[in-house]
Design a protein with these regions (language model features):
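Basic/polar phosphate-binding segments, predominantly the helix-turn-helix DNA-binding elements
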Residues: 5-7, 13-49, 63, 69-94, ...
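Pre-recognition alpha-helix immediately N-terminal to the DNA-recognition helix
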Residues: 1-5, 52-56
């Protein structure tokens, strides 16, 4: 399924255009269908998958926040921190302190 594809490739630089093409739909039609079936936008779903992955990296004190961001598929640490805070209500560093505290 498309969700399985996104899950498997979430660390890559995948775009809405690319996924819509793989699914065989226009970007507009894919966006509507994806929202209907997942109750999420494509980018929200993708970011949630990336954050799930980042949580495992953040649990390892040997992996920096920047490294966790890059290994999770985020283009840069600032985007990662912004998305992480929106999803989890705290920064990655704050999360790590709570997790390892």
């Amino acid at each position: 399924s498309i969700c399985e594809y996104i899950d498997a490739h979430c660390t890559e630089d995948i775009t809405l255009d690319e996924i819509a093409k793989i699914a065989g739909f226009s970007k507009y039609h894919f966006t509507r269908l994806f929202k209907q079936f997942t109750n999420n936008t494509f980018y929200k779903y993708l970011n949630q998958k990336r954050i799930e992955l980042a949580l495992t990296f953040l649990a390892d004190p040997n992996i920096s926040v920047t490294e966790a961001a890059m290994q999770s598929g985020f283009a840069n640490p600032s985007t990662f921190i912004r998305v992480f805070k929106a999803e989890k209500g705290c920064t990655p560093t704050e999360f790590r302190k709570m997790f390892t505290g």
